[in-house]
C-alpha cells in the first residue's frame, strides 16, 4: 500500500551559489558515504550530484509527510546500485522506498514513493 509520494525540483545553479557561499553546506546535506562520492566528482558534476541528493531527500521528506526538519538530511542516504540507479539505503521509513532522480539542463527533479509492506 502506498504510504506517500513526494516530488522536489532543485535548480543546480542555486545549489552552487549556496555551496560557493559556504562549502560546509554539502557536509550538512550528505552522509559520509555520499560525501565520498561527491569528493570523487569534479566541477559541474559535483553540483549536479549535490542538487540531486538534496532533491531526493526533500522528496523523501514530503512523502514521509513532514518536510525537512522532522527528518534530517543525514537521516536519509541515497547511494547508487551496481547499475548506477539511485537507491535509498538509509531512512526512518520501514517499508519499500522507490526513488527516481532526473537531470535536465539546470534542473534536478526527484520523486519518492514510500510503500508500506504487509505484516
Swiss-Prot record:
Disulfide bonds: none annotated. Its cofactor is Mg(2+). Mg(2+) binds at residues 8, 58. One of its GO terms (molecular function) is holo-[acyl-carrier-protein] synthase activity. One of its GO terms (biological process) is fatty acid biosynthetic process. Belongs to the P-Pant transferase superfamily. AcpS family. Transfers the 4'-phosphopantetheine moiety from coenzyme A to a Ser of acyl-carrier-protein. InterPro entries: 4-PPantetheinyl_Trfase_dom, 4-PPantetheinyl_Trfase_dom_sf, ACPS, Ppantetheine-prot_Trfase_dom. One of its GO terms (cellular component) is cytoplasm. It is found in: Cytoplasm. The keyword Metal-binding applies. Its EC number is 2.7.8.7. Keywords: Cytoplasm, Fatty acid biosynthesis, Fatty acid metabolism, Lipid biosynthesis, Lipid metabolism, Magnesium, Metal-binding, Transferase. It catalyses: apo-[ACP] + CoA = holo-[ACP] + adenosine 3',5'-bisphosphate + H(+). SUPFAM superfamilies: 4'-phosphopantetheinyl transferase (SSF56214). It is an enzyme of class 2 (transferase). This is Holo-[acyl-carrier-protein] synthase.
Amino acid at each position: 500500500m502506498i504510504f506517500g509520494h513526494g516530488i522536489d525540483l532543485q535548480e543546480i545553479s542555486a545549489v552552487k551559489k549556496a555551496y560557493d557561499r559556504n562549502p560546509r553546506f554539502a557536509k550538512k546535506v550528505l552522509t559520509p558515504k555520499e560525501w565520498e562520492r561527491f569528493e570523487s566528482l569534479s566541477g559541474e558534476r559535483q553540483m549536479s550530484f549535490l542538487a540531486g541528493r538534496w532533491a531526493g531527500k526533500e522528496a523523501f521528506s514530503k512523502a514521509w509527510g513532514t518536510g525537512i526538519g522532522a527528518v534530517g538530511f543525514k537521516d536519509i542516504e541515497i547511494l547508487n546500485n551496481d547499475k548506477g540507479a539511485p537507491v535509498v539505503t538509509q531512512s526512518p521509513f520501514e517499508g519499500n522506498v522507490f526513488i527516481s532522480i532526473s537531470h535536465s539542463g539546470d534542473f534536478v527533479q526527484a520523486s519518492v514513493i514510500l510503500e508500506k509492506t504487509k505484516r
